[in-house]
C-alpha cells in the first residue's frame, strides 16, 4: 500500500481553528515537520482541508 509524506510548509498563524486542529491530528506541530501516513481516504480528506499549508509526496 502506498504511503504519503506530508510536510507542513506554511505557518498556521491566522488560520481557522479547524485547520489548526487538522494539522495537529496529522501530527504536524511546527513548520517543516514531516510525517508519513498510510494512503487512506481519511488522511486524504485531512490533507485536502489544509492543502494550502502542506505539501504531499507519495512514498513507497
From Swiss-Prot:
This is Large ribosomal subunit protein uL30. The keyword Ribosomal protein applies. GO terms for molecular function: structural constituent of ribosome. Belongs to the universal ribosomal protein uL30 family. GO terms for biological process: translation. Transmembrane segments: none annotated. The lineage of its organism: Bacteria, Bacillati, Actinomycetota, Actinomycetes, Kitasatosporales. NCBIfam families: rpmD_bact. The gene is rpmD. One of its GO terms (cellular component) is cytosolic large ribosomal subunit. Keywords: Ribonucleoprotein, Ribosomal protein. Part of the 50S ribosomal subunit. It holds the Pfam family Ribosomal_L30.
Amino acid at each position: 500500500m502506498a504511503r504519503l509524506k506530508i510536510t507542513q510548509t506554511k505557518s498556521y498563524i491566522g488560520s481557522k481553528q479547524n485547520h489548526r486542529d487538522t494539522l495537529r491530528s496529522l501530527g504536524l506541530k511546527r513548520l517543516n515537520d514531516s510525517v508519513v501516513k498510510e494512503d487512506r481516504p481519511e488522511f486524504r480528506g485531512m490533507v485536502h482541508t489544509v492543502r494550502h499549508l502542506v505539501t504531499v509526496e507519495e512514498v513507497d
